[in-house]
C-alpha cells in the first residue's frame, strides 16, 4: 500500500515540476523569437525571474523521493540515463548562470552571448526530459543486476525523439501562455500569436504520440485492464482543448490553468501506464524495477510520508504566496534601474502593489 502511495506521489512531483518549471523552460526557448528589443528581452527574463529557482525545488524533490523511496530505481535510472541527465544538469546550471551574469557587463555582445546560452540551456532540458521519459515508458536495456546495455545514441530512437519534440512543444505552449499573462503591448500580442500557432502543432503531436505509444510501449495494458484509467488521457485532451478555448476568450489565467491540466494529464498517463514498473527492462521483463521490488523499507516509507504531509503543504503555501505577490504583468516601471523586490510579507492576504514585482534582473548600475 505504501509503495503505491509513494508511486503516485512520485508521479505528482514530476507533474508539478513539469507544470511550474515547464513555463520557465518554454519561455527561455522563446527568447530569441519573441524578444525583438533589449527591453522586451528584459521583460521576458523578469517574467521568469521571481519563479524559476523556486520551481526547481520540485525537481530536487522528485529526485530526492526517487533516491529515498525507491533507491534501486534511483540507482538504475541514474546509471542508465547518466549521459542525458548529466547534460540536463549542466544545462540547468548554465541557465542559472545566464540569469545572473547577463547584466553584469554593459555590452551588447556580452548580453547576446548570455542570451544564446540561456536559449540553449532552456531548449536542452525540454528535449532531454522528453527523450528520457519516452525511453522509460518504452523500456531500456538493463539486466537483472541493473547494468545498462546501451548508449546515448540508443536513446535517440524514434519514440525517444518523438517524446523530445512532444515535451519541447508542450513547454513552449505553456511558456507562451505565461508570457501573455506577464507582458503587455506588442510582446503580449506576439506571445498570444505564438501560443495560437503552437497549439494545433501540439494537438497533432499528442495524437501522433498516443499512436506511437501503442506500437512502442505496453502502457495501454494497464488501461485495458482498468478502463477507468482512460480518464487520464481524456484529462490531458480536455486541458489542451480548454487552453485554446480560454485563449480565444482572452481568459489567460484560465488558459494557463488548462495548459497545466494538460501537462498533469500527460504525466500521469505515461507514468501510471508503467505501474508498477519504474525502470522497465527491454531485455528481460523479470529485470524490471518496480515500485515494490525497488522500494525502501516500510519504516522508511512511513517516516517519509509523515515528513511529506508536513513539508509539502508548507512549500505549496510559500509558492502560492510568491505567485500571488508577483502575479501582475511586468511593466516598464518594473525595469527601472533602481527597482527592488518589495518584502511584501503583509501582502500575503492583500492585493500586491502595482510595482511589487519589481525587476529581478535590471541593467548593471556599475
Question: Where do the protein language model's features map onto the residues?
Answer:
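Long, contiguous internal "core" modules enriched in hydrophobic/ aromatic residues
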Residues: 101-255, 269
Amino acid at each position: 500500500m505504501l509503495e503505491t502511495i509513494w508511486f503516485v506521489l512520485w508521479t505528482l512531483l514530476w507533474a508539478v515540476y513539469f507544470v511550474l518549471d515547464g513555463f520557465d523552460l518554454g519561455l527561455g526557448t522563446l527568447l530569441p523569437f519573441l524578444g525583438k528589443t533589449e527591453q522586451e528581452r528584459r521583460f521576458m527574463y523578469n517574467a521568469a525571474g521571481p519563479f524559476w529557482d523556486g520551481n526547481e525545488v520540485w525537481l530536487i524533490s522528485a529526485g530526492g523521493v526517487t533516491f529515498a523511496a525507491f533507491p534501486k530505481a534511483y540507482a538504475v535510472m541514474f546509471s542508465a540515463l547518466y549521459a542525458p541527465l548529466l547534460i540536463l544538469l549542466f544545462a540547468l546550471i548554465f541557465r542559472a548562470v545566464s540569469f545572473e551574469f547577463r547584466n553584469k557587463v554593459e555590452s551588447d555582445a556580452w548580453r547576446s552571448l548570455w542570451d544564446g546560452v540561456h536559449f540553449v540551456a532552456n531548449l536542452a532540458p525540454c528535449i532531454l526530459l522528453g527523450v528520457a521519459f519516452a525511453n522509460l515508458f518504452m523500456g531500456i536495456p538493463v539486466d537483472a543486476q541493473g547494468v545498462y546495455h546501451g548508449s546515448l545514441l540508443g536513446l535517440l530512437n524514434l519514440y525517444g525523439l518523438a517524446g523530445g519534440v512532444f515535451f519541447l512543444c508542450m513547454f513552449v505552449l505553456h511558456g507562451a501562455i505565461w508570457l501573455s499573462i506577464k507582458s503587455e503591448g506588442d510582446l503580449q500580442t506576439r506571445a498570444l500569436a505564438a501560443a495560437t500557432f503552437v497549439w494545433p502543432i501540439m494537438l497533432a503531436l499528442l495524437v501522433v504520440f498516443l499512436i506511437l505509444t501503442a506500437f512502442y510501449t505496453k502502457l495501454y495494458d494497464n488501461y485495458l485492464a482498468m478502463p477507468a484509467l482512460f480518464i487520464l488521457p481524456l484529462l490531458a485532451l480536455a486541458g489542451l482543448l480548454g487552453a485554446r478555448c480560454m485563449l480565444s476568450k482572452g481568459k489567460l489565467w484560465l488558459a494557463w490553468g488548462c495548459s497545466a491540466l494538460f501537462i498533469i494529464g500527460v504525466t500521469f498517463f505515461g507514468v501510471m501506464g508503467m505501474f508498477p514498473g519504474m525502470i522497465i527492462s527491454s531485455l528481460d521483463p523479470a529485470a524490471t524495477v518496480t515500485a515494490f521490488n525497488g522500494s525502501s523499507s516500510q519504516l522508511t516509507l512511513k517516516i517519509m510520508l509523515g515528513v511529506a504531509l508536513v513539508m509539502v503543504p508548507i512549500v505549496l503555501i510559500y509558492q502560492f504566496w510568491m505567485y500571488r505577490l508577483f502575479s501582475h504583468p511586468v511593466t516598464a516601471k518594473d525595469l527601472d534601474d533602481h527597482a527592488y523586490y518589495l518584502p511584501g510579507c503583509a501582502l500575503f492576504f492583500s492585493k500586491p502593489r502595482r510595482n511589487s514585482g519589481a525587476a529581478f534582473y535590471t541593467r548593471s548600475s556599475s
